[in-house]
Structures are given as structure tokens and as C-alpha cells.
Design a protein with these regions (language model features):
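N-terminal membrane-targeting hydrophobic helices
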Residues: 1-145
């Protein structure tokens, strides 16, 4: 999934868990688990495209803008911010798209070659992510954030 998809789903998880009074350590653990689970859903990743540098800069930039907005103007709780950041953090390895050459370093276990990472063609894979964005926003709205 894209970095922003992980951030949005993490934020929605943080909104729900924060509303229920979950401790921050549990929010962090749940956000990491959510990242792994979402990576198994069939989706399209831009990391193997010709324009991966543009995609990764846009994705990471949009995610940073979202989290900064949530922290400053959005009045987000610590649970929302932490879950959003932690869920997105493993995908920062997309920034190695900026490096020359084809070798890609993957640090997070769900990014390793043996992990059952979901894959889909660009259009349906992007539609899946857009549906996840909408669901995440609805969950946050329903949780009062």
C-alpha cells in the first residue's frame, strides 16, 4: 500500500483505540500489525514503475502534510498521530527509489520477498487503496475525529 494509505488507516485505528482509552504502547503495536495486514491485501505499488521517484516524493510529501495538518490544525490526539506515523513509517523505504540503480533495500518484514505481499494491476489496485482511504475517513469521522 502507499505510505498515505497506511497513515490514514493508522490514524483511523488510533481514533478508535484512543476513544476507547487504549494505552499508547497498544496503539503502536496495533498500528504495526495493521501495516502488515494491509500489505497482504491486493494493491498496486509504484515502486517498480518508471516514475517511482515522482510517486514516492508525492506520496511521502502528502503523508507528511497530512500528519502535520492533523497535529497542528486538526487537533488530533496522540493516539491518532502516533498510530498514523507508526503505520506509515515502515513504508519510508520507498525513498530508496531516489537512489540510482535497481537495488531496493527492504527493512520491514512485510516488504521482504518471501512475504505474501498483495499485488494488483494499477487501476484495480489504486481503486482498492481509494476505498481504504474513504473507509478510514469514515471511521475517523464516526470516532469523533
Amino acid at each position: 500500500m502507499w505510505v498515505i494509505t497506511h497513515a490514514l488507516t493508522g490514524m483511523s485505528l488510533g481514533a478508535v483505540l484512543g476513544q476507547r482509552g487504549a494505552p499508547l504502547w497498544a496503539v503502536v503495536a496495533a498500528a504495526l500489525l495493521l501495516h502488515v495486514l494491509l500489505d497482504m491485501v491486493p494493491h498496486w505499488d509504484y515502486v517498480r514503475t518508471r516514475h517511482r521517484v515522482i510517486w514516492s516524493l508525492g506520496d511521502v510529501g502528502a503523508t507528511a502534510a497530512l500528519l502535520i495538518w492533523a497535529a497542528t490544525l486538526g487537533d488530533a490526539s496522540w493516539a491518532v498521530l502516533l498510530a498514523g506515523a507508526v503505520s506509515a513509517l515502515p513504508d519510508l523505504d520507498v525513498l530508496n527509489a531516489l537512489w540510482p540503480g535497481e537495488r531496493r533495500i527492504r527493512i520491514f518484514p512485510s516488504h521482504w520477498s518471501g512475504f505474501p505481499h498483495g499485488s494488483a494491476p494499477p487501476v484495480p489496485g489504486t481503486v482498492v487503496q481509494a476505498a481504504v482511504w474513504v473507509a478510514s475517513v469514515l471511521v475517523m469521522w464516526n470516532a469523533g475525529w
